UniProtKB/Swiss-Prot annotation:
Positions that bind GTP: 62-65
Pfam family, one: RapZ-like_N
Alphabetical list of SUPFAM superfamilies matching this protein: P-loop containing nucleoside triphosphate hydrolases (SSF52540)
Annotated GO MF terms: ATP binding; GTP binding
Protein name, UniProt field: Nucleotide-binding protein lp_0779
GTP-binding found in the keyword field: yes
Covalent S-S links between cysteines: none
Record's function text: Displays ATPase and GTPase activities.
Family, as annotated: Belongs to the RapZ-like family.
Alphabetically ordered keywords of this record: ATP-binding, GTP-binding, Nucleotide-binding
Length: 294
């Protein structure tokens, strides 16, 4: 049986980073197409399959109108019934405020802002794209990412992951820097004792053994850890059965330095015994950046 075409559909909010995404996929060896009319994709896929010369395609789809959106959903329905194409959707997102800021910096108009108000266009686009985001294999929140960090995130997900194995993204974060909007599950651990107030631990992080030991040795932490891990292990089969290719679990504390980092590491390592797990710490460098600026 011939190898199926690996198709990645890149979509998401206007201004969320699709240009950087295309460049990243080109570097990964994908044949990239920008804004092909969705109705042409099934025929294009057939031609590619017949030629046998192209194995990986990344297609960028932007929202132009409600009719264009309807074409996208029809296209996805057709691809679901195609056995020679393996389709994954990458949805790029960012907070409304960050998207508005980016548009103001570039002085561009939003494609859906009929009266010139960028925020109105962003809100309308988010509403239209909600069903597509729900279908996405991967959602990346670019609100706090640099272009380099977005590129690294794409490489992490697509450089070697050519199968459909269910995997888990474990993410620590600080509430003071905002919620990660790409998370499926968010857990707040600010109820645990904070190492920040221990002088010898304040400048360390949850990756350092003294901090990890302090956090994990608290009675409240052990009880939470056992119960939360048990819950996660009980619901994972359901997410797999629903066809999700990935699940993002975000654990947050105040600054994303100590408690959330230690617990994200510990829970991620436990889940890695049974699942493919990627662990990242979104805000662990924030304090270093603050110190360098002071």
């Amino acid at each position: 049986m011939a190898e199926s075409l690996q198709l990645v559909i890149i979509s998401g909010m206007s201004g969320a980073g699709k240009t950087v995404a295309v460049q990243s996929f080109e570097d990964l060896g994908y044949f990239c197409i920008d804004n092909m009319p969705p109705a042409l994709l099934p025929k294009f896929s057939e031609l590619v399959e017949e030629s046998g010369k192209i194995k990986k395609v990344a297609l960028v789809i932007d929202l132009r109108s409600r009719a264009f959106y309807d074409e996208i959903m029809d296209m996805l329905a057709n691809l679901d019934n195609t056995d020679f194409v393996s389709t994954r959707i990458l949805f790029l997102d960012a907070s409304n405020e960050e998207l508005v800021s980016r548009y103001k910096e570039t002085r561009r108009s939003h494609p859906l802002a009929m009266e010139g108000r960028v925020m109105d266009g962003v809100r309308k686009e988010r509403e239209l794209l909600a069903p597509l985001k729900d279908r996405a294999s991967y959602v990346i929140d670019t609100s706090t990412l640099t272009p380099r960090e977005l590129r690294e995130s794409i490489f992490d997900k697509f450089e070697t992951d050519q199968d459909e194995t269910f995997h888990i993204e474990m993410l620590s974060f600080g509430f003071k820097y905002g919620l990660p909007i790409d998370a499926d599950i968010v857990m707040d651990v600010r109820f645990l004792p904070n190492p920040y107030y221990i002088p010898e631990l304040k400048k360390l992080t949850g990756l350092d053994k003294p901090v990890a030991d302090y956090v994990m040795q608290q009675p409240a932490t052990e009880a939470f850890y056992q119960q939360f891990l048990s819950m996660l292990e009980s619901i994972m089969p359901g997410y797999e059965a629903e066809g999700k290719s990935s699940l993002t679990i975000a654990i947050g504390c105040t600054g994303g330095q100590h408690r959330s980092v230690a617990l994200t590491q510990r829970i991620g390592e436990a889940l890695a015994k049974h699942y493919k797990v990627h662990i990242s710490h979104r805000d662990i460098e924030k304090r270093k950046e603050t110190v360098n600026r002071s």
